[in-house]
Amino acid sequence: MRFLIGALLTLQTLVQASSMSSMPNYYPVPEAPAEGGFRSVVYFVNWAIYGRGHNPQDLKADQFTHILYAFANIRPSGEVYLSDTWADTDKHYPGDKWDEPGNNVYGCIKQMYLLKKNNRNLKTLLSIGGWTYSPNFKTPASTEEGRKKFADTSLKLMKDLGFDGIDIDWEYPEDEKQANDFVLLLKACREALDAYSAKHPNGKKFLLTIASPAGPQNYNKLKLAEMDKYLDFWNLMAYDFSGSWDKVSGHMSNVFPSTTKPESTPFSSDKAVKDYIKAGVPANKIVLGMPLYGRAFASTDGIGTSFNGVGGGSWENGVWDYKDMPQQGAQVTELEDIAASYSYDKNKRYLISYDTVKIAGKKAEYITKNGMGGGMWWESSSDKTGNESLVGTVVNGLGGTGKLEQRENELSYPESVYDNLKNGMPS
């Protein structure tokens, strides 16, 4: 995550300027210091364009340093492939031409590139896996051939589609062998990315990140220090601590454990962060994941008590978008000591654990106080706007957009199979 300095930085800047001079309509940002700056990371899911009506153009790009485009899938051979080509590469948005000559990319991928072009501090990464596709990691990760196929094909997608790196979301390695295989998979990816960077005209470093667990039953199986050698940063999934699978209602994204109702906080972000650091992961590489949704508990007498069912939801039962919160008739409780909040409707006996603006501010304080790498959110379609935005609240709490990490994205993809992307998406 470091830039070269002195003469090497000057040389790199000259090379970049020379390479980009032949490519039209770029909007460069000033060079930033090598150290300092928070990451602001968000997952954009390709299925959001359907019922949610959420498209890349809806992202408030100046508030983010990284967008993780989710999800690509994995074949048993290790081949990484797009999960929805209509959403990813085919859908025509307003302004896209049907009779444009050449082999061109459209869909969310084109829109992501245009976001990068107009926001030079915004990087995009292809996220591979996720909860649904995670069972597909085990087989290819177990062999050298499978790992090479994974690394080579994910790199090809990155080069073809104009990403700045790849993000791996394996939930979760189950034993010692799979943990070792994960390290070797990251090593293969890091080597492939660095080899491409070495021959790339601009010499930019391409990024490798993962979505990492916040539950000790999962991260204690991982080889954290060995993995860290290959990663640029970790997206700590500090949410889903409680839900439909539990016996009592609980907080789903608390920073600290509760001393008054310990049964309501089976996990905590703080324990995970401390354990990662103790294992050898630098604090400034840990990006704190936060939810833009809430988890519900029905027929309950309050936090930390039994429940029966989870009720409805915005898109799935028991899960409510933050923008749908709080529900009418519910009273909001904010517990600053554990950095958690929830709403409760005593008439309906319905409780939803979610982050409020005040709690988002407390999490920004926690990130700053502990020298962490920034914040991450799942997922972009669910936030509110204006002063009620959780993303905006955290970014402001970190010092505003001027305190975000400043690292210019990559726009040159000379090996892309898509003519319009290879040519810089000319107007």
UniProtKB/Swiss-Prot annotation:
Optimum pH is 6.0. Active from pH 4 to 8. Keywords: Carbohydrate metabolism, Chitin degradation, Chitin-binding, Glycoprotein, Glycosidase, Hydrolase, Polysaccharide degradation, Signal. GO terms for cellular component: extracellular region. The keyword Glycoprotein applies. It catalyses: Random endo-hydrolysis of N-acetyl-beta-D-glucosaminide (1->4)-beta-linkages in chitin and chitodextrins. SMART domains: Glyco_18 (SM00636). Residues 38-401 form the GH18 domain. Belongs to the glycosyl hydrolase 18 family. Chitinase class V subfamily. InterPro entries: Chitinase_II/V-like_cat, Chitinase_insertion_sf, Glyco_hydro18_cat, Glyco_hydro_18_chit_AS, Glycoside_hydrolase_SF, Glycosyl_Hydrlase_18. Gene3D superfamilies: 3.10.50.10, Glycosidases. This is Endochitinase 1. Changing T13I: In strain: IFM 50993. It holds the Pfam family Glyco_hydro_18. Residues 1-17 form the signal peptide. Glycans are attached at N387. One of its GO terms (biological process) is polysaccharide catabolic process. The active site is at E171. Changing D169N: Loss of function. The record marks D169 as: Transition state stabilizer. Its EC number is 3.2.1.14.
